Amino acid sequence: MPLKSLKNRLNQHFDLSPRYGSVKKIMPNIVYADGFNPSVGDVVKIEKSDGSECVGMVVVAEKEQFGFTPFNFIEGARAGDKVLFLKEGLNFPVGRNLLGRVLNPLGQVIDNKGALDYERLAPVITTPIAPLKRGLIDEIFSVGVKSIDGLLTCGKGQKLGIFAGSGVGKSTLMGMITRGCLAPIKVIALIGERGREIPEFIEKNLKGDLSSCVLVVATSDDSPLMRKYGAFCAMSVAEYFKNQGLDVLFIMDSVTRFAMAQREIGLALGEPPTSKGYPPSALSLLPQLMERAGKEENKGSITAFFSVLVEGDDLSDPIADQTRSILDGHIVLSRELTDYGIYPPINILNSASRVAKDIISESQNLCARKFRRLYALLKENEMLIRIGSYQMGNDKELDEAIKKKALMEQFLAQDENALQPFETSFQQLEEILR
């Protein structure tokens, strides 16, 4: 058989195309190379002339060349360095032995607890749950926080956002939710956080107990690709446990820094900046991640809380606006409430849970609605009450709100260590409204 015919037949069954090439051009967040033809999402590696290596993911595939974004920094790389194909798509280790461990988005443990014994490698990018395979959210997901359980009740498989400016208490609230919920598995993605905040979150907010937790960490000094895929890696871990029939709590801090990472990548690729400099891909990436959470028929559930950092407490920020439109509820933290010493500073009037009315009883629903109505009356007339312009007896409902003001504020405030069962929260709510 002629050599050319043999090669053609072999090509039908095996990929004989070259798996190495060379660097052609290096830019701040993207490297261009040629020599082989990878697909978008494939993982490649640069072998630098100084002997070090740099791993990256293909984000541009053209006929004559391809571009990839590095997972780590590319100092020392130069045109002509060898580029090798590593694997098709990014995978991440999963298994029960991940519990209690802290990993980076490359699947490397960073907790000094020895090598990781994992079950298998799972793809990082997967298809969200099909709409008709999603289970109805009909069970309560208690988080141990009075104002959430009583007034913004969450359900198993619900997706919620925690919206707040910097320094208002997002991390503290997320720690309370993690410790207060009854989910057997908790997966936490810390994306774009300062390095010192990682041990602080573990020791202060989680009280050092990681027995039921898996942490995936990409700090602010990591590359944009690490920060982007850290969130997807954590979601893949949550999906593994969900597919085992378990209820999983997924916590991510923060969506804003995740979107900022994609903004850096998108702008490097030449995407046009739109609102506040975010390219279209930064906004379209959000549902790809968030829709993977939820409840699936004949499997478990992923109940997700995504924190969103809003600049200057501006809820019209494009990332905050897009996130709110995707999720099933939003919890807004108010800087004003911190001035009154109310922690966690949840603004119940600006917050909402879209499934609450479907999972609590009619009497519980009436209690929650009445509390919000009385609290809204207090806020609307706060100035009149403070300056003494309101006379008791003019409005029966406002009179009731004024009498119950101290009790309502006491209900909204909660020490971070004083977590309590769902039933206790509603008993206290009923006692206030009697």
Curated annotation (Swiss-Prot):
Cite the EC number. Answer: 7.1.2.2
Q: Name one Pfam family in it.
A: T3SS_ATPase_C
Can you state which reaction this protein catalyses? Answer: ATP + H2O + 4 H(+)(in) = ADP + phosphate + 5 H(+)(out)
Is the keyword Isomerase assigned to this protein?
Answer: no
Q: What is its main location?
A: cytoplasm
What would you give as a GO molecular function for this chain, any one?
A: ATP binding
Keywords in UniProt for this one? ATP synthesis, ATP-binding, Bacterial flagellum biogenesis, Bacterial flagellum protein export, Cytoplasm, Hydrogen ion transport, Ion transport, Nucleotide-binding, Protein transport, Translocase, Transport
Annotated binding of ATP, by residue:
A164, G165, S166, G167, V168, G169, K170, S171
What do the Gene Ontology cellular component annotations say?
A: cytoplasm; type III protein secretion system complex
* GO terms for biological process, alphabetical: bacterial-type flagellum organization; protein secretion by the type III secretion system; proton motive force-driven ATP synthesis; proton transmembrane transport
Q: Which SUPFAM superfamilies match?
A: P-loop containing nucleoside triphosphate hydrolases
Where, per UniProt, does this protein localize? Cytoplasm
Q: Which family is this sequence assigned to?
A: Belongs to the ATPase alpha/beta chains family.
- What function does the entry list? Probable catalytic subunit of a protein translocase for flagellum-specific export, or a proton translocase involved in local circuits at the flagellum.
List the protein's name: Flagellum-specific ATP synthase
Which organism's genome codes for this protein? Helicobacter pylori (strain ATCC 700392 / 26695) (Campylobacter pylori)
